[in-house]
C-alpha cells in the first residue's frame, strides 16, 4: 500500500526517506552544565533514527551560554562543543535518518543566575525576573552568535538547521508586540519587529546553503497579540529570504489559556501553506499514523513533527506503518522480528 507519510521528501539537496520528523524537545541532560552532549543524547536520538524517523531534530541548542533555558541545555556557542554534536549526527546517520538542529536563545525565559536578556524589560509573568533590555551591541552580538552556530552546525554534520522563533523565546519576543516595546529600529512596526529575525536569517545564509526551517508560534492567544494572519506576512518575508519550511507551533509568548485537542495546530500549518505559499510542518498532538496520513493527504502540511508520541514510543514509525498497511524497511539487525507489532498503548 502506498503512503504519503512514508513517501520521500526532498528539500534542496537533502532527501528524507519519509515525512516523519522528531520534534525538538529539550532534555535538560547536559549534566555538567557545560552544554556538552552526553551518552544519554546519543542513545536518545540514535534510537529514534533506528526507529525509522526520517529527520531527527536535536533539541533547542543555545547559541550563547546566557541564552540557555537552564544550565543543563545543550550548547553550540564554542568550538569545543562540536565534537559531541558530531558524534550525535554520526549516530543518527549510521541509523538511516537525516539530522537537524534547532538553534535557539531563551531570551527572557532563561532561568539562570545571570541576567535574562530581552527586547524590552518586560517579564514573562509575575514570578519570573525582569529581563534586561538588549542594547544594539548585544543584538548584533546575538545575530553573530547565530551565524557562528550555523558554521558549527555544518562542521558537526547536520543536514538541516531550524531557527527557533517560537514559544516565547528571544526571537518570538522580538516578533510579538506583547513583549517588544522598543522604539528603535527593532521595535514598533511589523517590519521593525521582524528585523532581528531578518538579520539572523541573512547572517545564516552567508555561511549555510542547506535546508533552513523556522519554527513559529502562529498565534499569541491574546487580543493584543499576533494571529496567524500576521504570520502570513512574516512567513512571506521568510520565504523571500530563502527559508524552506515553516514549522508551525503556537503560544507561550505570554501566559494564555489554549484549547488543546488532537491536531489543534494543524490549522496554522494549513493556513501558512496556503496563504504564504511555503512548505510547512504540522505539530501538536499528532499521535497516530492515520491522523498524520490524513494531514498530508489533505495537503495541510508537508512534514509531520512528532513530539511526545516519540517519547512514549521511539518506534512510532513502525506502529504507524502497521496501522497504514505499509511495509516498512527495517534495520537489518531487526529482521528476525518480522510482522506486525502491537498498537496498544
Swiss-Prot record:
Its cofactor is FMN. The keyword Transferase does not apply. It catalyses: A + NADPH + H(+) = AH2 + NADP(+). Substrate binds at residues 28, 164-167. Keywords: Detoxification, Flavoprotein, FMN, NADP, Oxidoreductase. GO terms for biological process: response to toxic substance. GO terms for molecular function: FMN binding; NADP binding; NADPH dehydrogenase activity. Its EC number is 1.6.99.1. It is an enzyme of class 1 (oxidoreductase). InterPro entries: Aldolase_TIM, NADPH_DH_bac, OxRdtase_FMN_N, YqjM-like. The keyword Signal does not apply. Gene3D superfamilies: Aldolase class I. It comes from the Bacteria. FMN binds at residues 23-26, 60, 102, 215, 307-308. Homotetramer. Catalyzes the reduction of the double bond of an array of alpha,beta-unsaturated aldehydes and ketones. It also reduces the nitro group of nitroester and nitroaromatic compounds. It could have a role in detoxification processes. Belongs to the NADH:flavin oxidoreductase/NADH oxidase family. NamA subfamily. This is NADPH dehydrogenase. It comes from Bacillus anthracis. The lineage of its organism: Bacteria, Bacillati, Bacillota, Bacilli, Bacillales.
Amino acid at each position: 500500500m502506498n503512503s504519503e507519510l512514508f513517501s520521500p521528501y526532498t528539500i534542496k539537496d537533502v532527501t528524507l526517506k519519509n515525512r516523519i520528523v522528531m520534534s525538538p524537545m529539550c532534555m535538560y541532560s547536559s549534566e555538567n552544565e557545560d552544554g556538552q552532549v552526553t551518552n544519554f543524547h546519543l542513545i536518545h536520538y540514535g534510537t529514534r533514527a533506528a526507529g525509522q524517523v526520517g529527520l531527527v531534530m536535536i533539541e533547542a541548542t543555545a547559541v550563547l551560554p546566557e541564552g540557555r533555558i537552564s544550565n543543563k541545555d545543550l550548547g553550540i556557542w564554542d568550538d569545543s562543543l562540536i565534537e559531541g554534536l558530531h558524534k550525535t549526527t554520526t549516530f543518527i546517520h549510521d541509523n538511516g535518518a537525516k539530522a537537524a538542529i534547532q538553534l535557539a536563545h531563551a531570551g527572557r525565559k532563561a532561568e539562570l543566575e545571570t541576567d535574562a536578556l530581552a527586547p524590552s524589560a518586560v517579564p514573562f509573568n509575575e514570578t519570573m525576573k525582569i529581563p534586561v533590555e538588549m542594547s544594539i551591541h548585544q543584538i548584533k552580538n546575538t545575530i553573530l552568535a547565530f551565524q557562528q552556530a550555523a558554521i558549527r552546525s555544518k562542521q558537526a554534520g547536520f543536514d538541516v538547521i531550524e531557527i527557533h522563533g517560537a514559544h516565547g523565546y528571544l526571537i518570538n519576543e522580538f516578533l510579538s508586540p506583547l513583549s517588544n516595546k522598543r522604539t528603535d529600529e527593532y521595535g514598533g512596526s511589523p517590519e521593525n519587529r521582524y528585523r532581528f529575525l531578518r538579520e539572523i536569517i541573512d547572517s545564516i545564509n552567508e555561511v549555510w546553503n542547506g535546508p533552513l526551517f523556522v519554527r513559529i508560534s502562529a498565534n499569541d492567544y491574546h487580543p493584543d497579540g499576533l494571529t496567524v494572519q500576521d504570520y502570513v506576512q512574516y512567513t512571506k518575508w521568510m520565504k523571500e529570504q530563502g527559508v524552506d519550511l515553516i514549522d508551525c507551533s503556537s503560544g507561550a509568548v505570554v501566559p494564555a489559556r489554549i484549547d488543546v485537542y488532537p491536531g489543534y495546530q494543524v490549522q496554522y500549518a494549513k493556513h501558512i501553506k496556503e496563504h504564504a505559499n511555503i512548505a510547512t510542518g504540522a505539530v501538536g498532538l499528532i499521535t497516530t499514523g492515520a491522523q498524520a496520513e490524513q494531514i498530508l493527504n489533505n495537503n495541510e502540511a508537508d512534514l509531520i513533527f512528532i513530539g511526545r508520541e516519540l517519547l512514549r514510543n521511539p518506534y512510532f514509525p513502525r506502529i504507524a506503518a502497521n496501522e497504514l498497511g505499509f511495509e516498512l524497511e527495517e534495520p537489518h539487525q531487526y529482521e528476525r522480528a518480522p510482522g506486525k507489532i502491537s498498537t496498544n498503548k
